[in-house]
Every structure is written in structure tokens, then in C-alpha cells.
């Protein structure tokens, strides 16, 4: 439960022990407490001088939400500014309640304003029933990062440096440290991260790059855009990632690189892939768009190959408020090439050493990602906990005879998606879940080797049986860090009803 504490309640709780139980609940982690930044001044004015030293300790366990200019404008429509502002903030941020000593002061509250005793009863009482679960709600945790993000945006707006600049450099330094690499180069999208990496590796006309047919289009599309030919190798039936033994069969004198995909948040088996690359003198470009923070034998995704490519698409575990991406590397030579290529191949400006492109990351997106990066580990652990809850619930409900759970073969899996196999009944299950207002998605319904645009490659249905089987059987369930256990229980109960009719 997330609650906004009105200043009248806080003044009472800090002036006496009466009603302080809600603060104790917040301290104990039984609910998430918020205070409006405008409330701090009201507390300072409303408390006795000797009580003001109690304000600062509040901020060690309460979070601050800052009203936007629009929030303030809405609240000024009338004579009850403070009460209207509290309701406006609660509705825009999705808080469950405003805690006040005088709920009757709030007009049109629609039951949103509660006393301390009512909050206590609600937390101690039965959990509200669930009747809808979104696959992903990008805005659900916005209030959690609001202050940090708005500070970054304000800094950028005031400096007027919107393309590259210090914000991008700061993000690059933080990402390289996080991914355990020497360098990181911010670019315009995850797709462009793949393309610029191929260009930096000198891959082009007449070259072949081996990758998976079971992935997002950009993986193979970037290879074609670089002028090279994608060569597909089938996947492991458990991890959905490319297998080294299939890669080896595809290597020819024209092969210049391997592009393994760390699909759904789990790293591919990189040790044998890197051994093949060393044996045949091949570049390895990791498509880690879905796997920031994932690990393989204590090494982070993005540090395993020659370059690692990440996406900051808003739906990713670490997403911007628009498009963005980054390339990681520990190679001095590749780093210099990447920096030049992202600005049309120029060094210095207007003097072009090569044909590059406009692959620049803008400072606003860099600031947003930098602000969110400090939350990533906590969000990742929550996703991992959610995956454990799913596994336990599905096993307890005797559903593993009908569906295959996503195993964590290489710790640690970051669960960008929680993907189950539902066999021949996948499409029926998806329809049933949608009818019960449960968001779910098929990633990916048609493997790349049978996509119309790749017809000239000469592949046909049946060439990659594991990829085709995965495309026909897999289904992604809601797994974001915002999802609650009661929502997961609702989802599993509906899956149980689908398979067992109970």
C-alpha cells in the first residue's frame, strides 16, 4: 500500500504519540509512505521549535514527491489548496490513500482520504481482490523516480546542451562500471548500437554474421543494413539462446562475426562461443538489449564479447523516456571507432575519416537513464523474486505438467520477460488470459528465417526446429518489479482454471 501523508496528520504524529502507528508501519516496510515537498515547509511552520528536529529523520523512510506546475495549477482552482493538491498528487502518482486527521475537509475525495486507524485496518485486513493485471505499466513507478529524473531534465534544460555532452559522458562512465567494461558509448537506440558495432568491426559487403533466428528483428536487420549476410543457427530448447555447436556448423571463410542474443534476460552460453571466435578469429558482438545486469560465470552481459549492445527502449528493465542505447567495450581501438562513427565519422567536426551516421544519444534520455540506473539493482531483485514466486505457485498448483518454466541456467537471469512454454494450447491460453484482463505477449510469433524480407537468404520452414517450436509455444507473463504477489496469484489461478477447469 502506498500512502501520501498530509501535513495535518504528520504534525499530530510528530507532536504526540497519537496516530504515530502509520509512521511505524512505514518504518517497518509494511506500507510505502510519501510526503509532498510542499508539506516540509508546512511542518516547519506548524511544529514547535523544539519539535522541528523530528522532520529530517522522517526523510530516511518516507519518500518525497514534488508537485509539477500542472499539479499546482489544478490545486489552485478553489479555496482548499492543500487538500486539492494532496488529492491531485495521489491520483497522478497512483497512491492508494491520503492519510489525514480530518478526511471531511477533502471534497470529492471518492474514499481516497483515510484516517490513521483506517489505514491500519486496511493493512491488517484482507487484500483487495485483483481483477486485472497489465503486462507492463511503464508509468507505475514514475513517482518513485520523479525527483531524480526531474532534476536531470532541469539540469539539461538549463544548460541547453541537448545532444551528447556531460550527461552522456556521465552515463557512459556509470554504464561501463556497471557492465564491468573499460568503455561505453551512448547511441541513439539499441538497433543503432548493433549497427554501429558492426561498422566499427569493419563488417560489410560479402561478410557473414552468425546469429539466432529467434529474436527481435533488429538483430538480423542490422546485419543486412551493414551490408553483410545474416546466417542463422538454431537455439537451445531450454534457454532459447543460440548454441555453440550450431554456430560451428555455420562457419565459412566468409564468416566475420558471431552475434549471440541474451534473450529474455539470460546470457547465452558464452564460453564455447568465445572459444569458437578465438579459434576462427571472429568478432563477438553481444545483443544484450534485454539483459542489462545479467551475468555469466560472474561476468556481466556486455563484458563477455568484443562489444555489447544495449537498448534503453522504455519497456526495457532500464528504459529511457524515448529511444536510446549504448555499446560497451574494453578495446581501445573499437572505442575510438565507435565515437567517430556515431558523429558521421568526423574527427574533428566537419573532417570525416569514415562514413558513419547520426547515432548520437541525446542528453535528456541520458539523464533519465542515469537517474534510473541507481534503482536498477533493486528492480532486478524484485523481478527475480517475482520469478521465484511464479515458479513456486505454478509448481504448487500442479501446472508444470502443462507448461515449462523458464530455468535460470546461468545465474543471474534478470527476467526482462518471464516466458513459459504452453505447448499446442499457447494461443488458447493467451486468449483466455486476455479475456480475464491479464496482459501477456508472444515473443516472437514468426522466426526470422521465415520472415518475408529474408526470403533471399534461402531458408525454409523446418530449417530451425527449436526456434520454430519456441515461436509456436512460448508466452510471456507480467513480471515487472511493480507486480504484486496477489496479482501473480490471480494469474496462476486463471492458468489453473484454464488447464484443470477448477
Annotate each PLM feature:
Residues 151, 168-173, 181-182, 245, ...:
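PLP-dependent aminotransferase class I/II
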Residues 124-161, 478:
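N-terminal "arm"/small-domain region of PLP-dependent enzymes with the aminotransferase-like
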Residues 64-104:
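Active-site neighborhoods of divalent-metal-dependent phosphate/nucleic-acid chemistry enzymes
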Residues 161-208, 222-225, 232-234, 299:
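Phosphate-binding glycine-rich loop
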Residues 87, 91-135:
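Acidic, PIN/NYN-like endoribonuclease modules and their adjacent C-terminal/linker elements
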Residues 1-35, 45-54:
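Short, well-structured N-terminal submotif of metal-dependent ribonuclease cores
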Residues 286-321, 348-353:
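Conserved active-site segment immediately N-terminal to the catalytic lysine
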Amino acid at each position: 500500500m502506498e500512502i501520501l501523508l498530509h501535513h495535518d496528520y504528520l504534525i499530530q504524529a510528530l507532536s504526540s504519540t497519537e496516530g504515530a502507528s502509520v509512521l511505524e508501519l512505514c518504518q517497518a516496510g509494511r506500507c510505502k509512505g510519501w510526503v509532498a515537498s510542499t508539506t516540509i515547509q508546512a511542518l516547519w511552520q506548524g511544529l514547535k521549535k523544539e519539535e522541528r528536529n523530528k522532520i529530517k529523520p522522517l526523510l530516511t523512510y518516507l519518500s518525497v514527491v514534488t508537485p509539477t506546475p500542472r499539479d499546482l495549477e489544478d490545486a489552485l482552482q478553489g479555496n482548499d489548496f492543500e487538500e486539492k493538491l494532496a488529492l491531485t498528487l495521489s491520483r497522478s502518482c497512483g497512491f492508494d490513500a491520503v492519510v489525514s486527521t480530518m478526511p471531511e475537509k477533502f471534497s470529492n475525495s471518492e474514499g481516497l482520504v483515510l484516517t490513521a486507524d483506517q489505514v491500519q485496518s486496511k493493512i491488517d485486513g484482507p487484500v483487495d481482490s485483483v481483477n486485472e493485471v497489465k503486462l507492463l505499466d511503464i508509468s507505475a513507478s514514475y513517482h518513485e523516480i520523479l525527483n531524480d529524473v526531474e532534476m536531470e531534465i532541469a539540469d539539461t534544460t538549463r544548460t541547453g546542451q541537448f545532444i551528447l555532452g556531460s550527461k552522456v559522458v556521465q552515463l557512459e562512465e556509470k554504464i561501463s562500471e556497471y557492465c564491468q567494461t573499460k568503455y561505453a558509448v551512448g547511441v541513439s537506440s539499441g538497433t543503432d548500437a548493433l549497427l554501429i558495432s558492426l561498422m566499427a568491426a569493419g563488417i560489410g559487403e560479402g561478410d557473414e554474421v552468425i546469429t539466432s533466428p529467434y529474436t527481435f528483428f533488429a538483430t538480423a536487420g542490422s546485419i543486412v543494413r551493414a551490408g553483410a549476410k545474416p546466417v542463422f543457427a538454431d537455439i537451445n530448447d531450454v534457454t532459447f539462446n543460440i548454441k555453440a555447436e550450431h554456430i560451428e556448423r555455420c562457419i565459412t571463410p566468409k564468416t566475420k562475426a558471431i552475434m549471440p542474443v541474451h534473450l529474455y534476460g539470460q546470457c547465452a552460453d558464452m564460453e564455447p562461443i568465445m572459444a569458437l571466435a578465438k579459434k576462427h578469429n571472429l568478432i563477438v558482438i553481444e545483443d544484450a538489449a534485454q539483459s542489462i545486469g545479467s551475468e555469466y560465470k560472474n561476468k556481466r552481459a556486455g563484458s563477455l564479447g568484443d562489444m555489447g549492445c544495449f537498448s534503453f527502449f522504455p519497456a526495457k528493465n532500464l528504459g529511457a523516456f524515448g529511444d536510446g542505447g549504448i555499446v560497451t567495450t574494453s578495446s581501445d581501438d573499437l572505442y575510438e571507432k565507435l565515437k567517430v562513427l556515431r558523429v558521421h565519422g568526423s574527427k574533428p567536426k566537419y573532417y570525416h575519416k569514415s562514413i558513419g551516421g547520426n547515432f548520437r544519444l541525446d542528453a535528456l534520455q541520458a539523464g533519465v537513464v542515469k537517474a534510473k540506473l541507481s534503482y536498477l539493482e533493486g528492480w532486478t531483485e524484485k523481478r527475480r523474486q517475482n520469478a521465484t514466486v511464479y515458479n513456486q505457485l505454478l509448481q504448487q498448483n500442479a501446472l508444470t505438467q502443462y507448461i515449462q518454466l523458464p530455468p535460470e541456467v546461468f545465474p543471474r537471469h534478470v527476467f526482462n520477460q518471464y516466458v513459459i512454454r504452453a505447448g499446442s494450447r499457447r494461443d488458447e491460453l493467451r486468449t483466455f488470459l486476455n479475456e480475464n484482463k491479464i496482459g501477456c505477449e508472444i515473443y516472437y510469433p514468426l522466426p526470422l528465417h521465415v520472415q518475408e524480407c529474408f526470403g533471399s537468404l534461402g531458408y525454409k520452414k523446418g530449417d530451425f526446429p527449436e526456434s520454430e517450436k519456441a515461436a509456436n509455444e512460448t508466452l510471456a507473463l507480467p513480471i515487472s518489479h511493480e507486480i504484486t504477489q496477489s496479482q501473480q496469484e490471480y494469474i496462476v489461478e486463471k492458468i489453473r482454471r484454464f488447464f484443470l477447469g477448477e
